[in-house]
Amino acid sequence: MAKITRALISLSDKTGIVEFARELAGYGVEILSTGGTAKLLRDAGLTVKDVSEHTGFPEMLDGRVKTLHPKVHGGLLGMRSNPEHVATMKEHGILPIDMVVVNLYPFEATVANPACTLEDAIENIDIGGPTMLRSAAKNNADVTVVVDPADYRTVLDEMKASGGSVAKETNFRLAVKVYQHTAAYDGAISNWLGARTGEGVATYSDTITLQFKKAQEMRYGENPHQSAAFYVERQVQEASVSTARQLQGKELSYNNIGDTDAALECVKQFSEGPACVIVKHANPCGVAIGKNLLEAYDRAYATDPESAFGGIIAFNGELDAETAKAICDRQFVEVIIAPSVSKAAVEVVAAKKNVRLLECGIWPAQPAQRLDFKRVNGGLLVQDTDLALSAELKVVSKRQPTAQEMIDLQFAWRVAKFVKSNAIVYGKDGMTIGVGAGQMSRVNSARIAAIKAEHAGLEVQGAVMASDAFFPFRDGIDNAAAVGITAVIQPGGSMRDAEVIAAADEHGMAMVFTGMRHFRH
């Protein structure tokens, strides 16, 4: 391990750099720097040599050219163990640079701003930074390269232990981190620019680069024989399972995360009052609105108490102690997630130490559109996320729905969007009465919804029915009418719409078309 004698520091994120540079200076390391970083370090009382002085060449083109010079890259790429490299460096007056501390212009943060222009984005594409990082990382046998402030302490501790050197194993690990960082950076640029054409913004680029960071190594995947890990998007900001803070409980499993995502995204649909969603195997088994969270939970649980066992529970408001106690006293639960959790509720749930309690923060009323991905063998299906709900509802039956039926229809319709297809949801008074999920025939989903309601002791008479897609035959309507359903909401669009509408009229049911399908596979 050679002693570090010279370090080049140039940063956008200057977190912790003054303290880091001060300790480097304590080992006699000469510090080279540029622009704002150099000023910050000088203002802190450190001796800094400008890169332009080191190279004998001025910064130019509004700072676009600062470090793109042989005296920088020769000092980084020259192999200290190669006599020819050493001789060439000496011949041209190139001094070795043993450490690079660089992070990049904030391109992703810049383009995350809805007001970002193409010019703004272009000016935040870093050129010199990635070039230095790659040069230093390539020659990691001789150069320490630091791209993450979280590594400052590790580097300093090694220098302290060795008298000013960094182990080659550490240099290699840091170099790998650099290539991961620059790949993500270039991927973000490629994705953003690739979706822009001369005519504006295209939805899909010709190529896409997905960049996720590992957040958790898991014991196993969907099943115990499968290995797994959880990766999160680098710039995700909206309240989600990916950004949630775990307050207590065991580590989240692969299935926990998938089910919690389903529950949270479903409960986000409801803003008219306190709401609760209970999910099992990614399907809502109970959804309800109440005067408060406790009532919402009680009603959601009542839909299907058996399926709620071992489920995931999501709320759209702060979890209070009374609701937390009702859950813990009544059922086994894997995960509870809410925008916030009261201190008293945390204390209540603490008695059940294995319950995973998550706090996700408040979400916007209108979530930003995002892309949805599904892996297939050898490919990737990409679509925009199904966030929309039909703005225009069309009554196609002779009978108009009552005001309460219309409220219940829209409630059930929102739930159906989160039930695996074929999806049927029975609802009444802001509560699911029965849920039929994942059947190959729609009429069987309707039958299951009725069976669920009967099994839970819930009255179907006067309830409404929502279907995620059209009814291909009238049998689903006949079946619903037989158990007491009085109104139906569905997309419409079947070749047999006329027969289906006629069936509704025969039974005196109201029927509403949305014109929008919500398959979920």
From Swiss-Prot:
| Pathway of action | Purine metabolism; IMP biosynthesis via de novo pathway; 5-formamido-1-(5-phospho-D-ribosyl)imidazole-4-carboxamide from 5-amino-1-(5-phospho-D-ribosyl)imidazole-4-carboxamide (10-formyl THF route): step 1/1; Purine metabolism; IMP biosynthesis via de novo pathway; IMP from 5-formamido-1-(5-phospho-D-ribosyl)imidazole-4-carboxamide: step 1/1
Per the UniProt entry, the Enzyme Commission number(s) are 2.1.2.3, 3.5.4.10
Q: List the disulfide bonds.
A: none
Catalysis performed (reactions)? (6R)-10-formyltetrahydrofolate + 5-amino-1-(5-phospho-beta-D-ribosyl)imidazole-4-carboxamide = 5-formamido-1-(5-phospho-D-ribosyl)imidazole-4-carboxamide + (6S)-5,6,7,8-tetrahydrofolate; IMP + H2O = 5-formamido-1-(5-phospho-D-ribosyl)imidazole-4-carboxamide
Record keywords: Transferase included? yes
This protein's GO CC annotations:
cytosol
GO annotation, biological process = 'de novo' IMP biosynthetic process
**Keywords annotated in UniProt:** Hydrolase, Multifunctional enzyme, Purine biosynthesis, Transferase
Q: Name one GO molecular function term.
A: phosphoribosylaminoimidazolecarboxamide formyltransferase activity
Q: Which InterPro entries match?
A: AICAR_Tfase_dup_dom_sf, Cytidine_deaminase-like, MGS-like_dom, MGS-like_dom_sf, PurH-like
**Family membership:** Belongs to the PurH family.
Q: What is known of its domains?
A: The IMP cyclohydrolase activity resides in the N-terminal region.
Q: What is this protein called?
A: Bifunctional purine biosynthesis protein PurH
